[in-house]
Every structure is written in C-alpha cells, then in structure tokens.
UniProtKB/Swiss-Prot annotation:
One GO biological process term: protein modification process
EC code(s) of this entry: 2.1.1.77
Name assigned to this protein: Protein-L-isoaspartate O-methyltransferase
Subcellular location: Cytoplasm
Coiled coil: none
Function: Catalyzes the methyl esterification of L-isoaspartyl residues in peptides and proteins that result from spontaneous decomposition of normal L-aspartyl and L-asparaginyl residues. It plays a role in the repair and/or degradation of damaged proteins.
PROSITE patterns reported for this sequence: PCMT
Keywords: Cytoplasm, Methyltransferase, S-adenosyl-L-methionine, Transferase
Family: Belongs to the methyltransferase superfamily. L-isoaspartyl/D-aspartyl protein methyltransferase family.
Keyword DNA-binding: no
Molecular function, one GO term: protein-L-isoaspartate (D-aspartate) O-methyltransferase activity
Length: 211
C-alpha cells in the first residue's frame, strides 16, 4: 500500500470503530487492505468513504461498515472454514482471508471472479479457493463450513446453504426483497435458530443464472 492509501485505510478503520465495530482483528484487516484496488480508477478517490460503490455488471462493493459488521458477526464463532457467496470485487474475501484459515468463495459473474482472483493474488492471499457458479447452491464438494457469508439479499434462505453448515456453524445472510434484514442463523444438529441483526440494503442474490 502507498503511504496515502495506508493512512486512508487506517482512518476508515477508526471511523468504523466509532460506528460500533469492536473486533480488533477486523479493524486491523480493514486498516491494511487497499480498497481502491477493488474499484475502477474513476472511483478510486471514493475508496475510503463508508459507502457502497458500483463495480459493474449491476453489482456493488459493499459499504465498509457492513463488510466489517458481517465479518465481526462471523468471527464470534471462530470459524475454521468459511464459504462466501458472492465474491464480487473480492474486497470482502480479502478481509476474510486475513482472518480465517480457509476461505471458499463462489461468484456467478465470470468477469468479476477473474478480477477478484487477480486482486487477492496481488495481495498475497493464498488461502482462498474460487468457484464460478451459482452461489444459491453453495459449494457442496467443499462442505461442511463453520461459517457461510452471503453478500447479496436472498428472497428466502437457500436450503442448500443450510445443509452445508457444520454443526454449530453460522450463516450470515441478508434476507428480503424491498426491506431486508441481516440475519444470523445457527445450526443445532437438524434444527436451526435465527436472529435478526439489523436492517440492510443489498443487491439481490440471483438463483441459477450465470453470466
């Protein structure tokens, strides 16, 4: 990272701490990840604003607060193996890869997946496996997962993702259409408990359509 980018990332982490993010490992990952790397040059000047930004293909890079919040919720359960549904720009994956031993990530838009893979390689993050496919179906061959994070809003909770959770595993997912709720779902053998965290706004999770 350049000195300017490092200063900007550190300042962003401080803003997120002021906004309620408490996990020091999450704040450290935010502070040392160059968010401008995950944006077009035309938007690089907005990289350290606490806002979602377009990345093309009708998709967005999530607001840093939401990235940090979802990561914090996941880390409370100390997951060893995590599935991310919706690689997008790769920014959320870059944060997670610094914090969990093994990350699997699925993206349905090939162009975004290729870019994300290149970015994480550039950051020397090598504990990440990438799949081009329908995130609604998860990644069965690599399951089970201690944690699953979905970075797009599902109209309903995908059964495939629930089935790929390990015992005691958690699913962090925005659910809903116009009004969306960020939910944490925990597996207890063959039953699940759910908790509403807060109201959020995400692009929709598309079922079965590759691009």
């Amino acid at each position: 990272m350049t000195r300017v980018a490092l200063t900007s990332a550190v300042n962003l982490a401080k803003k997120l701490q002021d906004a309620g993010i408490r996990n020091p490992a999450v704040l450290k990952a935010i502070s040392q990840t160059p968010r401008e790397l995950f944006l077009d040059n035309a938007l690089a000047h907005k990289a350290y604003e606490n806002t979602a930004l377009p990345i093309g293909q009708g998709q967005t890079i999530s607001q840093p607060y939401i990235v940090a919040r979802m990561t914090e919720l996941l880390l409370q359960h100390q997951p060893q193996k995590v599935l991310e549904v919706g690689t997008g720009s790769g920014y959320q994956a870059a944060i997670l890869a610094q914090l969990v031993p093994e990350l699997c990530t699925v993206e349905r838009i090939k162009a975004l997946q290729i870019q994300a893979r290149q970015r994480l390689k550039r950051l020397d993050l090598h504990n990440v496996s990438f799949k081009y496919g329908d995130g609604w179906q998860g990644w069965l061959n690599r399951s089970p997962y201690n944690g699953i994070m979905v970075t797009a809003a599902a109209a309903k909770i995908p059964e495939a993702l629930l089935s790929q959770l390990a015992e005691g595993g958690v699913l962090i997912i925005p659910v809903g259409e116009e009004t969306q709720q960020l939910m944490r779902i925990t597996r207890h053998s063959d039953r699940f408990s759910s908790e509403v965290i807060e109201t959020v706004k995400f692009v929709p999770l598309v079922n079965g359509e590759l691009a």
